[in-house]
């Protein structure tokens, strides 16, 4: 079970449809950084600029994270501080300041990197500021996060917009009890939550979460938490709805990763399947992993043309066969039983009877609550 494009849009408000975040990547970004931002890269063959230099150019050099402050709160404060600076400029100077701010937001927050420097691979896409809003930045965020989760060797090695995973867990796995609601009805959903600061060690936190996941009935997972939400408060949903519920390739410059929606949708008998995307580029094919480019000048609109065509055609629809939670739980239990649980403390249930009863009980409780 993983976040989907609909989750990204509802939680962050970032577009997940439209033009793919793709183009040409370079071995050096020194020339575009100097020309479009008026700054310098760290090294000649680098795609990083100093965060402090970016903030200083926007007159917000001292805007650092405060203790207990979330990324969302930090960026809101940074935006407010930079607003006055942006309002004072006109013409080319205003465009340069806006590109600096967008580079900071995209390179540090949406497509975050390890350490303090800010990535600027997105800079060529910001040359024409009038088209910046047409890109599917939310889909790029998800591709970047998937790639990070698939390559990280330690719990602390994940990069990307981690608050997405936190809020996603608050809705889909409420039994974890990790978040505190603060602004009921606010949209995007990210604004509704206050992130609790846990003083325990990271190892201890991860261990506790693993223990809970090992023993919780799968009937307590909320597959469709958006049911009951008013879409009227989020008008941007209708625009990108055609991208929901589909197997599709996600693009983030030199990272191209498949979203296997069949592995997360409420479909019957497909959760353990491996969905392979047909491709003519067999030497590249690594199911479940991303395509990451080497340090060469690469035009990704040509190099991954087949995957880009898939995006432009909005992938392939995944239809759910389950008409109710009870149907889903019954079929799931019959098909997998206790095999889907990795925890050693969960009782062996080869015929899926415990899982079946849990699913029926959960469905009955929900029906009672709806009365």
Task: List where the protein language model places each region.
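Structural stabilizers in ordered domains
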Residues: 1-371
């Amino acid at each position: 079970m993983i976040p989907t494009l609909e989750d990204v849009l509802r939680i962050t408000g970032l577009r997940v449809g439209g033009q793919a975040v793709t183009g040409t990547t370079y071995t050096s970004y020194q020339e575009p950084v100097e020309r479009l931002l008026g700054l310098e890269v760290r090294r000649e063959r680098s795609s990083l600029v100093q965060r402090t230099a970016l903030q200083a150019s926007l007159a917000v050099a001292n805007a650092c994270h405060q203790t207990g402050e979330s990324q969302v709160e930090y960026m809101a404060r940074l935006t407010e501080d930079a607003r006055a600076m942006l309002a004072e400029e006109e013409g080319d100077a205003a465009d340069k300041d806006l590109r600096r701010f967008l580079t900071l937001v995209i390179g540090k927050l949406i497509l975050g990197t390890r350490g303090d420097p800010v990535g600027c691979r997105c800079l060529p896409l910001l040359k024409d500021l009038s088209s910046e809003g047409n890109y599917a930045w939310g889909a790029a965020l998800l591709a970047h996060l998937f790639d990070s989760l698939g390559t990280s060797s330690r719990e602390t090695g994940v990069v990307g917009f981690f608050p997405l995973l936190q809020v996603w867990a608050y809705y889909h796995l409420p039994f974890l009890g990790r978040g505190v609601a603060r602004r009921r009805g606010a949209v995007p959903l990210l604004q509704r939550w206050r992130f609790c600061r846990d003083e325990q060690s990271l190892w201890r936190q991860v261990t506790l979460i693993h223990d809970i996941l090992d023993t919780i009935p799968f009937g307590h997972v909320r597959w469709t938490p958006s049911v009951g939400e008013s879409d009227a408060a989020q008008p941007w949903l209708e625009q990108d709805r055609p991208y929901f519920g589909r197997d599709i390739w996600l693009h983030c410059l030199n990272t191209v990763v498949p979203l296997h929606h069949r592995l997360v949708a409420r479909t019957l008998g497909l959760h353990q399947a491996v969905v392979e995307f047909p491709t003519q580029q067999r030497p590249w094919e690594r199911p479940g992993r991303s395509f990451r480019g080497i340090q060469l000048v690469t035009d990704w609109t040509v190099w991954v043309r087949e995957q880009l065509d898939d995006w432009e055609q909005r992938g392939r629809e995944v239809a759910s066969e389950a008409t109710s939670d009870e149907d889903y739980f019954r079929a799931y239990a019959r098909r997998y039983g206790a095999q889907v649980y990795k925890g050693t403390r969960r009782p062996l249930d080869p015929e899926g009877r415990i899982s079946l009863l849990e699913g029926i009980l959960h469905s009955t409780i929900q029906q009672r609550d709806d009365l």
